């Protein structure tokens, strides 16, 4: 899975976490079953642009906000395999 895919999946998990929402809730909003959402979160296959657009619309956030995870939450949502991402100011 690419760094962007990892960041997107982690961002979605983080957004659900801070909203106290479940994968089941998000899957129902997307008209998917939970197993399809789980596969997408694992990158098999990765989310496509239309799916990401729907997710950000459901959550009421921008794509940039989806990709924003506070540093102190990185380990929780990335584990030890934090993607090698360039940080810009």
Positions of the model-derived regions?
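DNA major-groove recognition helix of helix-turn-helix
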Residues: 41, 51, 70
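A short, Lys/Arg-rich alpha-helix, primarily the initiator
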Residues: 1-22
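The alpha-helix within a helix-turn-helix
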Residues: 16, 27, 56
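DNA major-groove recognition helix of helix-turn-helix/homeodomain DNA-binding modules
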Residues: 50-65
């Amino acid at each position: 899975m690419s760094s962007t895919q990892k960041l997107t999946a982690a961002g979605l998990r983080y957004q659900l976490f801070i909203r106290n929402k479940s994968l089941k809730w998000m899957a129902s909003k997307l008209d998917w079953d939970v197993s399809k959402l789980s596969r997408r979160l694992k990158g098999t296959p990765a989310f496509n642009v239309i799916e990401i657009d729907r997710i950000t619309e459901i959550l009421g956030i921008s794509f940039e906000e989806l990709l924003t995870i506070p540093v102190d939450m990185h380990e929780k949502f990335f584990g030890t395999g934090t993607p090698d991402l360039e940080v810009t100011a």
